[in-house]
C-alpha cells in the first residue's frame, strides 16, 4: 500500500490534479451560501507566531501567501541551483532555446495586456499576471500525452518553466516591491551573506541554514521587498555537497517535494482561486483586465514562445529539439499558457485582493489556463507521435 501511494504521488500528473481539485473546491466554497461564510472565516482565521513584542499576528491567508509560498520559492531556488550546477541549465546549448523562448513568453503576454489596458494606470499594475507558466499543470498535461510528445520537448517545457519562474522572481523583485526600509534590507543582506559563508564552508548541519533562512524571511518581509524573494535567495545558498559528503540540497529538495506539491500549492490554490461569481455578469469577462489576462495567457504565451523559438531555429542559431517538429513545438507552446499558480500570485501583488474588477481577473486566470491546457492537449495529441501498442506511458 505504501509503495502504491508513493507511486501515485510521484506521478507527474498527480500534483496537477491536486491543484485542480483545490481550485474547484475553492470555487464551490465561494459560491454556495453557507460554505461562503465558512470559506471567508477560514481565510481570516488569526494565527499568531512569536511572543510579546516579537510576534506576527496575521490571518491565515497571509501565512499561505507570504510564508508557505516562501517555502515554494525556496524549493524553486533549490531546483534552479541544482539544474545550474548538475542539470539542464549547466550547458549553454541546452538552455539557450527554452530561455530565449521564455523571454518571448513573457514579452508577448505583457504587451497584449498592456495594449488592452493602456488607458488605465491601475489596471496596468497587472501586466505581469499572464507572463508565467505553471510547471505542475504543464507537466501534468505533458504526462497525459505520454509518448506522443518526444522527450526533448518535455525537457524543453521543463527548462522553459524553470526560466519562467526565474523571470517571475525578477519581475516581483523589481516591480512589486513597496517603499524600501533600508534598515531591514541591511539586516536581510547580512543574513544572506552569512548563508553564503555557511554554504562556502559546506556546513553539514541543516539547523543553522533553517534559522538563518527564517531570519532572512522576517527581515525581507519588513524591508518592502516581497517576502517570497527570501525563499529563492535562501535556496541558492544551500550547498550541493557538505563537508560530510552528503548532498544537503538534494535532501532538502526531496523532503520538501511532497509538502510543496500536496500542501503548499493546493492550499494556495484553495485560498486564492475562490472567485465569488454570485451576481457576476458574463459581460464582466469582456472588460479590459480579464480580457488582457485571458488573451495574454492563451495567445500571448503561445505566440511569444513559438515565434522566438521559430526565429532561432530558422536562423540556424540552434537546432530543433531532437525528434520534434514545428507542429509539436507549437502544441507545447499552447500548453505553456497554463498560468494558474504564479498568475494568481502576481494577481494578488497587483490588485491586493481587491474586487474592483468583480474578481474577473482571477476567473480570467482560471479560464485562460483551462483553455490553454485543453486546446494544447488536443493539438499535441493531433500532431504528436502515435504511441505503439504495448508501450506504457513513460511517466508511469
From Swiss-Prot:
<feature type="transmembrane region" description="Helical">
    <location>
        <begin position="126"/>
        <end position="146"/>
    </location>
</feature>
<keyword id="KW-0915">Sodium</keyword>
<feature type="transmembrane region" description="Helical">
    <location>
        <begin position="96"/>
        <end position="116"/>
    </location>
</feature>
<feature type="transmembrane region" description="Helical">
    <location>
        <begin position="207"/>
        <end position="227"/>
    </location>
</feature>
<dbReference type="GO" id="GO:0015385">
    <property type="term" value="F:sodium:proton antiporter activity"/>
</dbReference>
<keyword id="KW-0997">Cell inner membrane</keyword>
<keyword id="KW-1003">Cell membrane</keyword>
<feature type="transmembrane region" description="Helical">
    <location>
        <begin position="255"/>
        <end position="275"/>
    </location>
</feature>
<keyword id="KW-1133">Transmembrane helix</keyword>
<dbReference type="GO" id="GO:0006885">
    <property type="term" value="P:regulation of pH"/>
</dbReference>
<dbReference type="InterPro" id="IPR004670">
    <property type="entry name" value="NhaA"/>
</dbReference>
<keyword id="KW-0050">Antiport</keyword>
<comment type="function">
    <text>Na(+)/H(+) antiporter that extrudes sodium in exchange for external protons.</text>
</comment>
<dbReference type="InterPro" id="IPR023171">
    <property type="entry name" value="Na/H_antiporter_dom_sf"/>
</dbReference>
<protein>
    <recommendedName>
        <fullName>Na(+)/H(+) antiporter NhaA 1</fullName>
    </recommendedName>
</protein>
<feature type="transmembrane region" description="Helical">
    <location>
        <begin position="363"/>
        <end position="383"/>
    </location>
</feature>
<feature type="transmembrane region" description="Helical">
    <location>
        <begin position="290"/>
        <end position="312"/>
    </location>
</feature>
<keyword id="KW-0472">Membrane</keyword>
<feature type="transmembrane region" description="Helical">
    <location>
        <begin position="15"/>
        <end position="35"/>
    </location>
</feature>
<keyword id="KW-0406">Ion transport</keyword>
<feature type="transmembrane region" description="Helical">
    <location>
        <begin position="155"/>
        <end position="175"/>
    </location>
</feature>
<keyword id="KW-0813">Transport</keyword>
<dbReference type="GO" id="GO:0005886">
    <property type="term" value="C:plasma membrane"/>
</dbReference>
<feature type="transmembrane region" description="Helical">
    <location>
        <begin position="60"/>
        <end position="80"/>
    </location>
</feature>
<keyword id="KW-0812">Transmembrane</keyword>
<feature type="transmembrane region" description="Helical">
    <location>
        <begin position="179"/>
        <end position="199"/>
    </location>
</feature>
<comment type="similarity">
    <text>Belongs to the NhaA Na(+)/H(+) (TC 2.A.33) antiporter family.</text>
</comment>
<keyword id="KW-0739">Sodium transport</keyword>
<feature type="transmembrane region" description="Helical">
    <location>
        <begin position="329"/>
        <end position="349"/>
    </location>
</feature>
<dbReference type="Pfam" id="PF06965">
    <property type="entry name" value="Na_H_antiport_1"/>
</dbReference>
Amino acid at each position: 500500500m505504501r509503495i502504491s501511494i508513493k507511486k501515485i504521488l510521484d506521478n507527474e500528473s498527480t500534483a496537477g490534479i491536486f491543484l485542480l481539485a483545490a481550485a474547484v473546491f475553492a470555487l464551490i466554497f465561494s459560491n454556495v451560501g453557507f460554505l461562503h461564510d465558512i470559506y471567508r472565516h477560514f481565510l481570516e482565521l488569526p494565527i499568531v507566531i512569536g511572543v510579546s513584542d516579537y510576534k506576527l499576528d496575521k490571518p491565515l491567508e497571509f501565512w499561505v501567501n507570504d510564508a508557505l509560498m516562501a517555502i515554494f520559492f525556496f524549493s524553486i531556488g533549490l531546483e534552479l541551483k541544482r539544474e545550474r550546477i548538475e542539470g539542464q541549465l549547466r550547458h549553454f546549448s541546452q538552455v539557450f532555446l527554452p530561455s530565449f523562448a521564455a523571454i518571448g513568453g513573457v514579452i508577448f503576454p505583457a504587451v497584449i495586456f498592456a495594449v488592452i489596458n493602456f488607458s488605465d494606470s491601475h489596471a496596468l499594475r497587472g501586466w505581469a499576471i499572464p507572463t508565467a507558466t505553471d510547471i505542475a499543470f504543464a507537466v501534468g498535461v505533458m504526462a497525459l500525452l505520454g509518448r506522443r510528445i518526444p522527450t526533448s520537448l518535455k525537457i524543453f517545457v521543463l527548462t522553459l518553466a524553470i526560466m519562467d519562474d526565474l523571470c517571475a522572481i525578477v519581475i516581483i523583485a523589481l516591480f512589486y516591491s513597496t517603499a524600501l526600509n533600508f534598515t531591514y534590507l541591511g539586516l536581510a543582506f547580512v543574513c544572506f551573506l552569512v548563508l553564503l559563508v555557511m554554504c562556502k564552508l559546506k556546513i553539514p548541519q541543516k539547523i543553522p541554514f533553517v534559522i538563518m533562512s527564517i531570519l532572512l524571511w522576517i527581515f525581507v518581509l519588513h524591508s518592502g521587498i516581497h517576502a517570497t524573494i527570501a525563499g529563492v535567495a535562501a535556496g541558492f545558498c544551500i550547498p550541493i555537497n557538505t563537508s560530510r559528503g552528503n548532498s544537503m540540497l538534494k535532501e532538502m529538495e526531496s523532503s520538501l517535494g511532497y509538502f510543496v506539491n500536496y500542501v503548499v500549492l493546493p492550499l494556495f490554490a484553495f485560498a486564492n482561486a475562490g472567485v465569488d461569481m454570485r451576481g457576476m455578469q458574463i459581460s464582466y469577462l469582456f472588460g479590459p483586465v480579464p480580457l488582457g489576462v485571458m488573451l495574454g495567457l492563451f495567445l500571448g504565451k503561445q505566440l511569444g514562445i513559438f515565434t522566438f523559438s521559430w526565429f532561432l531555429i530558422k536562423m540556424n542559431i540552434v537546432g530543433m529539439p531532437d525528434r520534434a517538429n514545428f507542429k509539436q513545438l507549437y502544441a507545447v507552446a499552447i500548453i505553456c499558457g497554463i498560468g494558474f499558480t504564479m498568475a494568481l500570485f502576481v494577481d494578488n501583488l497587483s490588485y491586493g485582493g481587491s474586487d474592483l474588477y468583480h474578481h474577473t481577473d482571477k476567473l480570467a486566470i482560471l479560464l485562460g489556463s483551462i483553455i490553454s491546457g485543453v486546446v494544447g492537449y488536443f493539438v499535441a495529441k493531433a500532431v504528436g507521435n502515435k504511441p505503439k501498442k504495448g508501450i506504457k506511458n513513460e511517466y508511469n
